[in-house]
Every structure is written in C-alpha cells, then in structure tokens.
C-alpha cells in the first residue's frame, strides 16, 4: 500500500493485529506476510470506515476486550445488536486469519 506509517484507532482494541503487521513489515521485512496480515484486517477497516459509526465501533471494540470506554457522546447512539454482532464476528475472523498467517510463517 506504500504507507510509511499509520495511526489506527482499531489498535486500541485489536493490538495483536497491528503488532503482527508491524512485525511482518518492519522487523522481518516480509512484505508478502504483511500484505496477508493487512488483507485480513481490511474487513475491520471497512466496518470502521463505513456507516458513520466509527466512534461507536471503537468503543464497542474496547468493551469486547473488557475495557469500559463509556457510551458515545450525544448525539451518537451505541451500536445496535446487529452492528455489535457484525463487529464481533469481523474481529474474530480477523484474529483467526492473522493467527494462521503468523503460524504458517514461524
């Protein structure tokens, strides 16, 4: 993708994925592995960037990790059940894929 750096709010609730990307690209210089990790992260990026619920997704992602970030400030509303289920599934799928990528290269 060509970026030299990246700041992503998702790293607050999915640090392992972001660390895997850093390790692959920066520490190992394995850009094929890095692209695979980033590809596994793209569904999460889509959820975060589409639908106008970025803040709510970040807060719920933190909740899934046991970190209480409180409710979103008004006028924002918390995620509904379907949005929560979708985000949780995207994170689960991403984590499984990245574990597999890391396992295949160790």
Each language-model region and where it sits:
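Flexible C-terminal active-site loop/helix
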Residues: 67-101
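Conserved, mostly hydrophobic/aromatic
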Residues: 34, 58, 87
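Surface-exposed charge patches
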Residues: 23, 60, 89
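Conserved short secondary-structure transition element at the edge of the structured enzyme core
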Residues: 40-76
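Catalytic alpha/beta core domains of metabolic enzymes, predominantly
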Residues: 1-49
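Short polybasic/polar patches that bind polyanions
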Residues: 25-26, 63, 92
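Eukaryotic N-terminal low-complexity, Ser/Thr- and Lys/Arg-rich leader segments
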Residues: 104-106
């Amino acid at each position: 993708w060509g970026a030299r750096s990246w700041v992503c709010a998702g790293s607050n609730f999915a640090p392992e994925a972001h660390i895997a990307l850093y390790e692959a690209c920066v520490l190992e210089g394995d850009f094929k592995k890095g692209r695979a990790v980033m590809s596994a992260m793209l569904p999460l990026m889509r959820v975060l960037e589409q639908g106008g619920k970025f803040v709510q997704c970040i807060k719920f992602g933190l909740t899934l990790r046991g970190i209480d970030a409180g409710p979103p400030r008004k006028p924002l509303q918390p995620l509904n059940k379907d949005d929560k289920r979708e985000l949780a599934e995207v994170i689960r799928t991403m984590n499984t894929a990245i574990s597999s990528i890391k396992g295949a290269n160790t």
